[in-house]
Structure formats: C-alpha cells, structure tokens
C-alpha cells in the first residue's frame, strides 16, 4: 500500500476586491504559518486567511477517519457545540497567541451569533509587535450540516488616527 502524499493543504486565492487570501485545511499548518508570518514577514499586521478543518476532538472520536464522523456532530448538537466552544477558548485561541508570540492577547471583544443554520463566535483584540499596533479578528463558524469548522483570521494595521 502506498502512503498518501503529504502535500501542503493550503491555497492562495484572490478575491474580487483584489485581496489575497490563504485558505488552510490543516490546523498545524495554519499555526505554523502564523508563527513564521510574525517572524519573517513585514505584513504580519495585514493578514487574512481562513481555515477549514475538523476539530481535534471530532477526529479523535472518529479515530482520525473523517469518513467515520457522526452525522450528529454539527451546530444542532449541544455536546458538539459545548466541546467546540471549549476547544476554541482553551486551545485554539491559546495556540494562536503562542504562534504570534503575543501572550498578552486576551480576545476580550467576544460575541456569539446563533441561528438555525450556524453558530458564529467572534473574537477580537489589539496587539503590538515590532512597535506596530494592529487589530486581530477571529471568527469561528460551525454549521448545521456537518462537523467542519470555518475559521476566519484577519489582522489590520492600526494607525495613530484609528487608535484615538
């Protein structure tokens, strides 16, 4: 039996507005990208990327086989929503802070939007790195039809005028 190719699961797309957007399918690659973005790139304060992935607790329950994920793992399941929220609050945001090397980020601007189709958690904060201030926004979405989670990560530079 041959092994599957471990190609990077990332795509770069350009939106209609001309914005470049990186789309990841793997949580570890997303975190590595954030870490290297802050170390290497001058545009760390102006990044937009998305991540579409199965949360680790879902894959663990399905023995790392996406085909075995239960149909009930979606936004209509209280257990799934509770575990996803814990994953986001206790692991994902913490790992993003570590990848960015900004332990002071608190993501205190929190909100939750819920309807029949989906649940969206929004997190935001401001940070400073290399004497440059920026706003970070993270949106985590789970839908009613499957266990896949969509994460939207965006940083925007703050100018002196926008801070006031």
Curated annotation (Swiss-Prot):
Q: Which gene encodes it?
A: RGI1
Which residues, if any, are the signal sequence? Answer: none
Look up keyword Phosphoprotein and say if it applies: no
Functional summary from the UniProt entry: Involved in the control of energetic metabolism and significantly contribute to cell fitness, especially under respiratory growth conditions.
Lineage of the source organism?
Eukaryota, Fungi, Dikarya, Ascomycota, Saccharomycotina
Q: InterPro entries given for it? A: RGI1 (IPR022554), RGI1_sf (IPR038235)
Main subcellular location of this protein, as a coarse class: membrane
Q: Which Gene3D superfamilies match?
A: Respiratory growth induced protein 1
* Entry GO CC: plasma membrane
Question: Native species of this protein?
Answer: Vanderwaltozyma polyspora (strain ATCC 22028 / DSM 70294 / BCRC 21397 / CBS 2163 / NBRC 10782 / NRRL Y-8283 / UCD 57-17)
Q: Which UniProt keywords apply?
A: Cell membrane, Membrane
Membrane topology, as annotated: Peripheral membrane protein
> Which protein, by its recorded name, is this?
Respiratory growth induced protein 1
